[in-house]
Amino acid sequence: LGASASSSTTHSEYIENAASIARTENTETNIQSLLRVLQAKEGLEIVEPNQRRNVHPLVVPVAKELATSTTIGIYIPHDDVDSLSIVRVSSCGKFLTLLARNPKEFIHREIVVEEAATDGAERALFDASGEVGKNAYELNDYSEKKGKLTLDQYLTMKVGRFPSSLRGLVERHLERKDEESALVACDVFKNQFQNWGEVYAFISDVYASLNRMEEARDFARSGVQ
C-alpha cells in the first residue's frame, strides 16, 4: 500500500509551518515518494509529523522503526532551511545519524540497495517510489556494474554522498592495508559532512587505529565542538 497523498501533504504543511519552507510541487512529490518507500520497507510504521515524543526539535518525524523505537525523520537545521536531510533519531531523541542529504538521494539509495540485496528479484521499493525512482534509476544498472564496483563505490559515484558508504570505503582501504587511500577518503568524508559529530568520531577512531594519536585527539575534540 502506498502512502496517501494526504499524508505527504500533512508532512509538507508541517515543514512549511515549522521552518518557513515554501511547499512546492517538487517538495510534495519527493516527500510523497519518501513516505511510500518507507511504508514499503519491513519493520517501519509511518507516523504523523506532530508525534514528537522523544524526537529532536529540528526533526520532523516520518516513520518509526518498530524493533528499535528509533525514528526516521527529516532534519531541518536552523542555519540551512533549504536542507531537508534524512536522519535516524535515537530512541531517547538526543542523537542523530545522517542517512542521506535529501529525500531523492535516500530514495535512490534504497532502490539500489534493494537490487543489490535481492539480485533484482525484489522491486517493492522501486515500485513504491513512483516517478521519483524511475527518473533517478535505470533498473539493473548496479547489477551490470557490480563486477567492477562495490556497492559503496557505486552509491558514492552514481547516487550521492552517504556517511555509511564513505565509512565503508575507508574500512575497505584499511582492510587492504592502503593507509594513504583511507586517509584521503577520511578527508572527503570530513569535507562533505563537516557539521556532523559522528564523522569526527569515526575519523578519530581511524587515526587511533593507525597509532596517530595526536591527530586522533584533534578530530575527537573537533567532534564535540
Give residue ranges: language-model regions:
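Long, contiguous interaction/recruitment modules in multidomain scaffold/adaptor proteins
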Residues: Q32-G160
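A surface-exposed partner-binding patch
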Residues: L1-D79, P163, R172, Q194-A201, ...
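Alpha-helical repeat scaffolds
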Residues: A182-F189, E214-V224
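Acidic-enriched, low-complexity/disordered segments with a strong bias for Aspartate over Glutamate
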Residues: E13, D79-D82, D119, D127, ...
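Alpha-helical segment of the N-proximal tetratricopeptide repeat
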Residues: E131-Q192, F202
